[in-house]
């Protein structure tokens, strides 16, 4: 039977390798679902749509852009990101505000990266704590505090960068 320190080391290795795998998977899933969503909801010329949407969004007051951007961010944090994004646009709410300037491929890529880190960190922290409780494995001292700090930092950085992104 493995000792407690071996179990802790196994948990840490498992956590770090899964974090990288999950992160890459979430990014690939998000990119794929966004692209599928855009191929389904954008039958007209993409460049024409981008220019007209950017003009509309630029004339919106900052507070309106910020509020609708935060709504878009909340939808982007759902596990099925692409489906949430498609639903948001299919009901034409996305035409109202900040979602419009986010409809360029580069900004969309940034949004994918910004939402991937908090999704992965939150999922992994929950999974590690649940598995350790079920298997009665004691986590290394300070692990949960460090993991939650990392999660809070990733959410904070994502929100700050998102606000910068939407205010451009």
Give the predicted meaning of each segment.
Residues 2-18, 136-142:
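Cytosolic juxtamembrane amphipathic/interface segments immediately preceding
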Residues 44-60:
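Perimembrane loop-to-helix junctions flanking transmembrane segments
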Residues 9-44:
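N-terminal signal-anchor transmembrane alpha helix
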Residues 35-46, 82-98, 125-128, 167-168:
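Membrane-helix interface motif
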Residues 55-124:
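Pore-lining transmembrane helices
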Residues 121-168:
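Terminal transmembrane helical module of multi-pass membrane proteins
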Residues 19-31, 61, 65, 69, ...:
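Alpha-helical transmembrane spans of integral membrane proteins, capturing the lipid-embedded, hydrophobic core
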């Amino acid at each position: 039977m493995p000792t407690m320190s071996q179990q802790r080391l196994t948990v840490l290795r498992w956590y770090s390798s899964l974090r990288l795998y999950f992160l890459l998977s979430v990014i690939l899933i998000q990119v794929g679902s966004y692209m599928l969503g855009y191929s389904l909801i954008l039958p007209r010329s993409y460049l024409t749509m981008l220019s007209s949407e950017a003009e509309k969004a630029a004339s919106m007051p900052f507070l309106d852009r910020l509020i609708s951007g935060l709504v878009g961010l909340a939808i982007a944090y759902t596990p099925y990101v692409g489906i949430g994004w498609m639903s948001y646009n299919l009901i034409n709410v996305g035409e109202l505000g900040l979602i419009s300037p986010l409809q360029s491929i580069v900004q969309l890529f940034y949004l994918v990266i910004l939402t991937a880190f908090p999704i992965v960190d939150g999922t992994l922290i929950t999974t590690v704590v649940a598995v350790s409780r079920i298997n009665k494995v004691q986590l290394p001292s300070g692990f949960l505090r460090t993991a939650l700090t990392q999660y809070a930092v990733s959410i904070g950085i994502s929100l700050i960068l998102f606000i910068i992104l939407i205010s451009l």
